[in-house]
Amino acid sequence: MHHRVTTTATALVLCAWLLLTGCSAQARQRDLMRKDPLASATWEGIEFLGSMESEDDGPKPPPTSMTRFFTTDLPLEETFDRMLTTAKQNGWGNEYTNGPEVRFMSKNTSEGGMRIILSTTLIRCEQYPTANFTLTFTFSW
């Protein structure tokens, strides 16, 4: 009987520890995203509409992410150039593309690899229906 109680107690402590460390890791990641200069950057000709963050609900929450929504009438390449220049000035690197409408960059942080995705095609939002450009922060697994 004593062995079963000890095993159960150990399992409960381990589960609680895993849950708490996972939650605190997401909180630290969210804090890093919010403090990154790109999270509050503005650019002439690119209007910021608002942002949304991933929810930590449920037993297995999605990867930590934050998306900023914009509208712009600038040519696509000029929009990319303005945002990517600011990103490079703030420690982002390893730029690559995924088709003509998506750019990626990454940087290493104390919580792992963080990535930004600049896009005209990803993530549409009912809350910001006029958005035609997004900047998404996410952590690589």
Regions of interest found by a model, annotated:
Residues 2-6, 13-141:
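An acidic-aromatic pocket/loop used at catalytic or ligand-binding sites
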